[in-house]
Design a protein with these regions (language model features):
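A short beta-turn/loop motif at secondary-structure boundaries
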Residues: 36-41, 169-170
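Membrane-helix interfacial anchor on the cytosolic side
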Residues: 27-29, 33-35
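A generic structural signal for well-ordered alpha-helical segments
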Residues: 23-24, 86, 112, 144
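Catalytic core of membrane glycerolipid acyltransferases/transacylases, capturing the structured
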Residues: 1-17, 24-27, 40-99
Length: 216
């Protein structure tokens, strides 16, 4: 895993992606992907996904087919195995308790989002305990506006049934990854960030069951 540290794109393709697929296979978790045609080859995007389970990570890593950097909470850096692997892959840790430090980290991370490498956010900030789509935070949308990059909304379903909240029980099941058409930020001012965020949330919610679309 760490021998690929000098090239994080190669590391992701040849270590992280197979790892995610093997984890899904042994669960087992069947995966279906819709909307792959909405991914433009060579385009860097700000990827925005709902967050239902720890298994979202395997689903996105294993089946999205995009080179990306995660934006993740600083606390994960100290988790044995996970922290050092994510650092080797060039992922982005932010200190959510320090707003200015978080902004500075995102600012320095911009250099990584080039040449088809994207950045992915869970804008709810944490997993939804009840499956309902939570309110979004603005970080992903501010970065998209600042870098003038399209937002690629993604809906994840089924993973919370494979690994339910509050347990370590893995259950055989099915998951779906829905990739929506990109949302352009062209002509959108920073003052309209809230509207951009609300519109993106509506797109992601549209592929969830009606009972899970309201803020949990």
């Amino acid at each position: 895993f760490l021998s690929f540290v000098s090239n994080t794109r190669v590391s992701s393709k040849w270590a992280a992606v197979p790892w995610a697929r093997v984890m899904a296979m042994v669960t087992p978790m069947r995966v279906r992907v819709e909307g792959r045609e909405n991914i433009e080859t060579g385009q860097s995007d700000v990827l925005v996904s709902n967050h239902q389970s720890q298994y979202d990570i395997f689903l996105l890593y294993g089946w999205l087919g995009v080179d990306f950097k995660w934006v993740m909470k600083q606390e994960l850096r100290s988790v044995p195995g996970i922290g050092i692997a994510c650092e080797a892959l060039g992922h982005i840790f932010i200190d959510r308790s320090n707003h200015q430090a978080a902004l500075a980290t995102l600012e320095s991370a911009k250099a990584k989002i080039v040449d088809g490498t994207s950045v992915i956010f869970f804008p709810e900030g944490t997993r939804s305990r009840d499956g309902k789509l939570k309110r979004f935070k603005k970080g992903a949308f501010r970065m998209a506006l600042d870098l003038d990059l399209p937002i690629l909304p993604i809906t994840v379903t089924g993973t919370r049934d494979v690994l339910p909240a509050g347990t370590s029980d893995l259950l055989p099941g099915s998951a779906k990854l829905i990739i929506h058409p990109p949302v352009s930020v062209e002509g959108i001012s920073a003052e309209a960030c809230q509207r951009l965020m609300d519109e993106t949330r509506e797109v992601i919610a549209s592929s969830l069951p009606a009972k899970l679309r309201s803020a949990g």
